[in-house]
């Protein structure tokens, strides 16, 4: 079983049939024909402006790229709304990132229905995001989600992370910021 960064097509295709049944964690499904994918096909690929094979827009790493762009876009949108500005500063955009809350309605609005809610704060840059598990089908060359959303174990993991961060800061003479 791999974690989320070892669960893309690039990780399994080179292994061919030997990768069949491989499982990995993920924070999003792949391969779905979402409204956003339909728009990308219509407004980009159908107009001859796409780079690469259109079928790759369904792959794990492409979707992660989409998510990064969505988070940046939503940070700017949050900052615009909160500060009442058209072009937010870097500090205002940081506020937008640190106060992001993507609800089911927000995911629907951006064309990715079914994605898990994410709420980011200064104290929690992870967003409290649950995880899915997926299995690779080598013959179909596709991932299948094989679990429901599994919540993070914050009560177990967070104290260990904070203790390790404090130890590292002390060893390296770093003053932690609030």
Report the location of each language-model feature.
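Segments of small-molecule ligand-sensing domains
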Residues: 51-62, 73-146
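Extracellular/periplasmic periplasmic-binding protein-like sensory domains
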Residues: 1-69, 149-153, 164, 168-175
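Short coil/turn linker and secondary-structure boundary residues
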Residues: 7, 85-88, 160, 174
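Conserved C-terminal helix/tail region of periplasmic/extracytoplasmic solute-binding proteins
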Residues: 97-106, 135-178
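Generic preference for hydrophobic/aromatic residues in regular secondary structure cores
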Residues: 1, 21-29, 112-119, 131, ...
